[in-house]
């Protein structure tokens, strides 16, 4: 899995510090309320709660100055992966990079492509070794 600026904490839109009213409205429709009124639903849609030893490897890519998805959200998911599953997951945080940096062919977007290629190649090579394929 390679989420680029993925959403990992669905309670963030309800935060008084960083509110996101549009996201909060959608989440209220999905869960039928807020994290306080429908905690079970929010637990079910929180990716960190589903991490196990069977979780596939992740390459998490996140801009450090992303105003929509706080980098701490991605870091928290990374820590969940590390605590429950150590299977070749990686976290790449990009200094001074905002949300949606890959929409236009910027230098940053171009530099990410070889990183993703190398990550996938490493996973493939590990799979080949595990299977005993030559």
Language-model features, listed with the residues they occupy:
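Acidic catalytic loop of the alpha/beta-hydrolase fold
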Residues: 10, 65-69
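Conserved serine/cysteine hydrolase catalytic core
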Residues: 47-55, 72
């Amino acid at each position: 899995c390679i989420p680029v600026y993925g959403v990992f904490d669905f309670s963030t839109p309800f935060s008084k510090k960083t509110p996101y009213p549009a996201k909060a409205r959608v989440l209220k429709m999905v869960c039928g309320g807020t994290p306080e009124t429908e905690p079970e639903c929010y637990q079910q849609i929180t990716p960190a709660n589903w991490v196990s030893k069977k979780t596939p490897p992740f390459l998490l890519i996140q801009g450090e100055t992303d105003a929509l998805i706080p980098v701490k959200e991605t870091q928290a998911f990374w820590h969940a992966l590390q605590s429950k599953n150590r299977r070749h997951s990686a976290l790449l945080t990009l200094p001074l990079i905002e949300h949606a940096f890959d929409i236009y062919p910027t230098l940053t977007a171009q530099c990410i492509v070889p990183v993703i290629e190398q990550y996938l190649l490493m996973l493939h090579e590990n799979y080949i070794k595990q299977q005993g394929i030559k």
